[in-house]
């Protein structure tokens, strides 16, 4: 797909990048999920089948890097007529609304590759990111919908094990538009990737101090390690978990916006007391209420 200079400048502006040496390719990808722990009966023995859920994303690659993905647009692959919405086969997506065909619709994210295996979810509001995605789709003349997510129907391999964290971009197919399919996995390929280190900005964010949670399991990510293994799934996977996982000691701020899980503190803040409403319980049973005390020492001195 050929872009005019004005289109490239506009895309650079949308993505907050310099248009000086910008050259743009647009493609569609599937961001698959690995098996998702799903405890439907509180015994911890349920696991969703690999690839039963996938996120289709509109991707934009620039020669100046980083790779940028707008997605997911639609998520899920279940028949609403035959599947129980609350069953492990079709878990609810928090904050999502149903789109055409019964699929849940999740707000898109803007994910940017900083370097190597280091990815960043751009700190933008969901409304702003969706606007960016729609305008990119308009520039690229592709439909922004749950049925087409950045690529013509049939050009993206469903349930592909390819991951943008682990994989590498292939040259675009010959001809126009320049869409491409993810490469097939090698026989030894597995579902994890090794991250050399966490971002240097692993600090609490005063702007969004909500605790951080593991997107895949109850295991906390409290101990950054050079050998730390993570699942190469989209951060939005956190929304598929039924039970809030264990919080981290520190949050990653805007490095993983969609992993932030704000706990509901209402019940935890309720104080049980045997006293009647509006009356302050006495700290000491023998203490006399101030209204029944005699004059204070200061009053006697005066």
Swiss-Prot record:
Bias (Low complexity) ranges: 196-209
Stretches the record annotates as Disordered: 81-100, 155-209, 269-302
Protein name, UniProt field: Uncharacterized protein ORF3
Record organism: Ictalurid herpesvirus 1 (strain Auburn)
């Amino acid at each position: 797909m050929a872009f005019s200079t004005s289109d490239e400048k506009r895309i650079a502006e949308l993505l907050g990048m310099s248009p000086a040496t910008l050259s743009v390719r647009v493609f569609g990808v599937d961001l698959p999920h690995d098996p998702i722990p799903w405890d439907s009966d509180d015994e911890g023995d349920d696991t969703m089948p690999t690839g039963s859920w996938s996120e289709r994303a509109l991707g934009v690659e620039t020669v100046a890097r980083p790779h940028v993905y707008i997605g997911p647009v639609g998520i899920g692959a279940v028949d609403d007529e035959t599947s129980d919405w609350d069953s492990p086969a079709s878990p609810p997506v928090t904050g999502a609304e149903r789109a055409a065909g019964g699929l849940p619709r999740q707000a898109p994210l803007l994910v940017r590759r900083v370097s190597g295996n280091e990815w960043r979810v751009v700190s933008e509001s969901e409304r702003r990111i969706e606007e960016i995605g729609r305008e990119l789709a308009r520039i690229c003349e592709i439909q922004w919908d749950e049925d087409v997510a950045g690529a013509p129907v049939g050009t993206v391999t469903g349930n592909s094990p390819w991951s943008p964290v682990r994989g590498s971009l292939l040259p675009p197919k010959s001809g126009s538009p320049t869409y491409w399919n993810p490469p097939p996995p090698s026989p030894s390929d597995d579902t994890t990737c090794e991250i050399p280190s966490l971002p240097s900005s692993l600090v609490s964010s005063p702007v969004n101090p909500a605790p951080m949670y593991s997107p895949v399991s109850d295991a906390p990510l409290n101990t950054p390690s050079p050998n730390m293994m993570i699942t190469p799934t989209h951060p939005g996977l956190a929304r598929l978990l039924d039970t809030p996982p264990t919080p981290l000691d520190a949050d990653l701020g805007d490095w993983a916006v969609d992993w932030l899980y704000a706990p509901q503190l209402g019940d935890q803040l309720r104080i049980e007391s045997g006293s009647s409403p509006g009356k302050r319980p006495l700290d000491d049973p023998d203490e006399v209420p101030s209204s029944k005390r005699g004059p204070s020492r200061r009053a006697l001195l005066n």
